Amino acid sequence: MVKKKFEGIRDIFKDDAVKFIILMGVMSLLADMTYEGSRSITGPYLAILGASAVTVGFVAGFGELAGYVVRFFSGHLTDRTRSYWTITLSGYLINLIAVPLLALAGSWEVAAALIIIERVGKGIRVPSRVVMLSHACSQVGQGWGFGLHEALDQIGAILGPLIVAAVLFFHGSYQMGFAFLLLPAILAISVLMISRSLYPNPHD
């Protein structure tokens, strides 16, 4: 009985759809480490650079607004072109590269622009990524597939701020915190490229 259950679990993880979901989940874990780690310190960072509390709130709110507005157009473009990987990769590149660049911001204006750009990047890639995931999840169970992906995603969301907190504790530098996030950003993009190479047409 135990052997049969083990073989059943093993067979599940041999499925290409499950492998794709796991790869995208690992990528999301690394991506969340990057931008959630960043978001945990952007407020104090803007304040240190000279931004007022009102400005910090405005930048955060406008960034979210811009990201959601972009999703509308990105979703429409995804439906028209079916260029799922191109749109997803473009969004992640913008989304993830903006984070470590915050280490080089010499003024709150530059930092604010990068924060908004990061949110826009997320808005670009969300619809196309969700479409690809939905195709994979439809083959293994929508709830289970999305649950697996979201579990990995949320692990990254927890680890990111914790890692940044550790960097600040030992180095006391916001710039060092943002610079350190370059590592998970590069790893996330690398996993995304591997996923594209292995599954060029995940919607088929």
Report each predicted region and the residues it spans.
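Flexible cytoplasmic inter-helical loops of multi-pass small-molecule transporters
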Residues: 2-4, 196-204
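Helix-loop boundary and gating motifs at the non-cytosolic
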Residues: 8-65
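Transmembrane alpha-helix termini and helix-breaking/packing motifs in multi-pass membrane transporters
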Residues: 44, 48, 159-176
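Helix-loop junctions at membrane interfaces in 12-TM secondary transporters
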Residues: 103-114
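Structural signature of the two symmetry-related core transmembrane helices
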Residues: 86-100, 182
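Cytoplasmic helix-loop-helix junction between adjacent transmembrane helices
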Residues: 114-155
